């Protein structure tokens, strides 16, 4: 079965993002396909490379990055939601005159078209 996820919760402060990552890992462990994860609204904070959890906490941002690197899962960040919340890649940072970029490697700024494409090509869309 082919899954796609939408994450609307931040990396820290709610259970949404950590539940989504655990679900993603379970889906892949069971032999299913996870085509992409789309981060929307507060979920874009999962791509902020400046997030620095305490040493005894799980690093969720790097957890998502590892999922991308080891499993090839596409990690899409809503560009409009990201820019409103101060998450930008090099291109957007330069365009907007920001002092630097903070988009974690492995994540891609995307429009809602990426979410629509995922919804059209998966068997199950799950929102967290």
Curated annotation (Swiss-Prot):
GO aspect biological process, one term: tRNA wobble position uridine thiolation
Keywords: Cytoplasm, Transferase, tRNA processing
EC number(s) recorded for this UniProt protein: 2.8.1.-
Coiled-coil residue windows: none
Subcellular location field: Cytoplasm
Active site: 78 (cysteine persulfide intermediate)
Gene Ontology CC annotations of this record: sulfurtransferase complex
SUPFAM superfamilies per the UniProt record, alphabetical: DsrEFH-like
Predominant location: cytoplasm
InterPro entries cross-referenced by the UniProt entry: DsrEFH-like (IPR027396), Sulphur_relay_DsrE/F-like (IPR003787), Sulphur_relay_TusD/DsrE (IPR017463)
GO-annotated molecular function: sulfur carrier activity; sulfurtransferase activity
Disulfide bonds: none
Function text: Part of a sulfur-relay system required for 2-thiolation of 5-methylaminomethyl-2-thiouridine (mnm(5)s(2)U) at tRNA wobble positions. Accepts sulfur from TusA and transfers it in turn to TusE.
Family, similarity comment: Belongs to the DsrE/TusD family.
NCBIfam families tied to this protein: PRK00207.1 (NF001237), sulf_tusD_dsrE (TIGR03012)
Assembly behavior: Heterohexamer, formed by a dimer of trimers. The hexameric TusBCD complex contains 2 copies each of TusB, TusC and TusD. The TusBCD complex interacts with TusE.
Listed name of the protein: Sulfurtransferase TusD
Organism: Enterobacter sp. (strain 638)
Originating gene: tusD
């Amino acid at each position: 079965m082919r899954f796609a996820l939408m994450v609307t919760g931040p990396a820290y402060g709610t259970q949404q993002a950590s539940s989504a990552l655990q679900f993603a890992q379970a889906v892949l462990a069971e032999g299913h396909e996870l085509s992409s994860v789309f981060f929307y609204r507060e979920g874009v904070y999962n791509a902020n490379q400046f997030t620095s959890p305490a040493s005894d906490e799980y690093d969720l941002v790097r957890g998502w990055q590892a999922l991308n690197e080891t499993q090839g899962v596409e990690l899409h960040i809503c560009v409009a939601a990201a820019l409103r919340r101060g998450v930008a890649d090099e291109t957007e940072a330069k365009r907007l005159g920001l002092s630097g970029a903070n988009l974690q490697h492995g994540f891609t700024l995307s429009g809602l078209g990426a979410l629509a494409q995922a919804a059209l090509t998966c068997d199950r869309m799950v929102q967290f």
